Amino acid sequence: LKKYKINAIIAEVEDKIKYKRQPLVGSSDALTIEEWKKLSEYAHERNISISPLVQGLGHASFVLKHEKYKDLRDDPESDWAFNPLDPKTYEVQYDLYRDALEALPHGKYLHVGGDEVKTTGRNSGKSALELQLIWLNKVCQFAEEAGRTPIFWDDMPLKQTGVYRPMFRPEMSKAKVDSIWNTNQEKLEAFLPQFPKNCIYMRWNYHSPEAYGNTKTMQWFRDHGLKVMGATA
């Protein structure tokens, strides 16, 4: 990686850390925090920083599959997502963050995940987007207080307000994309005050990053004073 001038890596750690604060979460083949530190130091000596991605709000089966954490599920029958309205959700997630940041001390970022998830807050009556932004603001505040820049997968706010599809349709005409945005943009912008400004919105698109719908979305973030980063792999 040094040869190719790579200077930063996001490592999706999930259960591959032997967590000290929530030891049940680490898998049997997980690396210890000290082993991760050695890897981080090795990379740092080569001008490469490693930052952790600790999955939440969804992709949380590595935590919620355990009996101990079942009460934190958004849907009691599914281990996919945390309940963003339960304060204990944040106690657990922050413990995982603390250990991950200790394991990877040279990173600049804390990637909090947040993709491919829709929650109800145990049928709270709040919308999925409202709930996600409640969660996002809390975890972004934690990241900032820990000295890290939070990164968030941006797909769900876009999907829940109807502007997601054009990003993956490079054959869609500019006029059609603009029409979809003109119809739905107001729904997205109604939530703008709740979008944390200290966050990087990571615009992932592995198949059609050049699509007009994708570049238009990235420009929307910039136009509204939000930081955006592309992820093509």
Over which residues does each language-model region extend?
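Active-site clefts of carbohydrate-active enzymes
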Residues: 116-122, 198, 219-233
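Substrate-binding cleft/loops of secretory-pathway carbohydrate-active enzymes
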Residues: 151-220
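Residues at the C-termini of beta-strands that transition into short coil/loop
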Residues: 54, 205, 232
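Acidic (Asp/Glu)-rich catalytic clusters
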Residues: 2, 41-45, 101-105, 189-196, ...
